[in-house]
């Protein structure tokens, strides 16, 4: 007797709830829990097109909502404040990691993928831990969130480049130029629509946002622009993020987020679950020496970015160290990039993500006490505040 898909869908959602609830009680991020669940049930769900599509919609809505947080003027302001730290982050976390992989004998595309996996700190894990540990009011939180936003701007473009390269595009000057043209065209389209169309539709949104039909317009826009990015052989993540930036120009972010958030919360766990089902350890954990090397470097790189970037931002040495130790966990963007890989590289990336998430959680929790051991318990909140009070 064939099990109805409706029953299977309900069972999957209940399993996600149970494992997520257990993870919450154990203070393990739900991202990690859902991936582990996917690995455990991979034999039953592998190759499910419906699960893949539902998860894809979930990740599109995640980055659509992220884009809605940042009107163009705010994006430019944040980018300027953390620009030096952001560039250092790209150079160390992405560039040096890629160089390490190439020195260990990997090809350029594989090295790019692993560098991409090691690049971005998990926004969701970091934000949740800042809130749960009551450190959101600490002086380092503004710098950390600014750096995360910078990564959120860079990472979709990085994903778009990697999507193009893993789709079979040769790494030549011509192919890279074409890729840049596509990205610029997609970004320009979003900026033009945002500034010249959506910025003028505030009254239209006010009149119609409360109608049940309006959610079709909002989510339809996110899916369509994400789909346009896929049509251009770019990433749906970039398209969704840009669609969010478009709607941010309406200046009705809070109301629009309330419309979308429940759909995101329903579908996003399915993305992490599906990713887990695609991971296979049938041949064991590949390239263990390289894995350890990349894992150690990924922690060191983020600490350096936090220490130097925090000082450039105006934080004290102690607060900067606390920030650096709180940035080492990888998550959603690393998973998106890892999903572009195949076979042993996907398994390698998956172990790295899970290990870095767990190490990052521990370092985040012990960051204040470690910083106290280095610099003592009393420290001024920031260089700027100290100068101002003097």
Curated annotation (Swiss-Prot):
Q: Say what happens when this gene is deleted.
A: Deletion affects endospore formation and germination.
Protein's GO biological process: ammonium transmembrane transport; proton transmembrane transport
Q: Name one Pfam family in it.
A: Na_H_Exchanger
Q: Does the keyword Cell membrane apply?
A: yes
InterPro entries to which the protein is assigned, alphabetical: Cation/H_exchanger_TM, Na+/solute_symporter_sf
Give its localization.
Answer: Cell membrane
Activity regulation, per record: AmhT alone exhibits antiport activity, but interaction with AmhM confers different properties, such as higher KM for potassium.
The keyword Cell membrane is annotated on this UniProt entry: yes
> Which GO molecular-function terms appear in the entry?
antiporter activity
Major location category of this protein: membrane
Q: Which GO terms describe its cellular component?
A: plasma membrane
Sorted alphabetically, the keyword list is: Ammonia transport, Antiport, Cell membrane, Ion transport, Membrane, Transmembrane, Transmembrane helix, Transport
Annotated TM spans: 2-22, 31-51, 52-72, 94-114, 143-163, 178-198, 212-232, 266-286, 288-308, 351-371
Give the membrane topology, semicolon-separated if more than one.
Multi-pass membrane protein
Entry similarity comment: Belongs to the monovalent cation:proton antiporter 2 (CPA2) transporter (TC 2.A.37) family.
Relate the protein's function as given in its record: Ammonium/proton antiporter that mediates the efflux of ammonium ions. Can also transport potassium or rubidium, but not sodium or lithium.
* Assembly, per entry: Interacts with AmhM.
Q: What is this protein called?
A: Ammonium/H(+) antiporter subunit AmhT
User: What gene is behind this protein?
Assistant: amhT
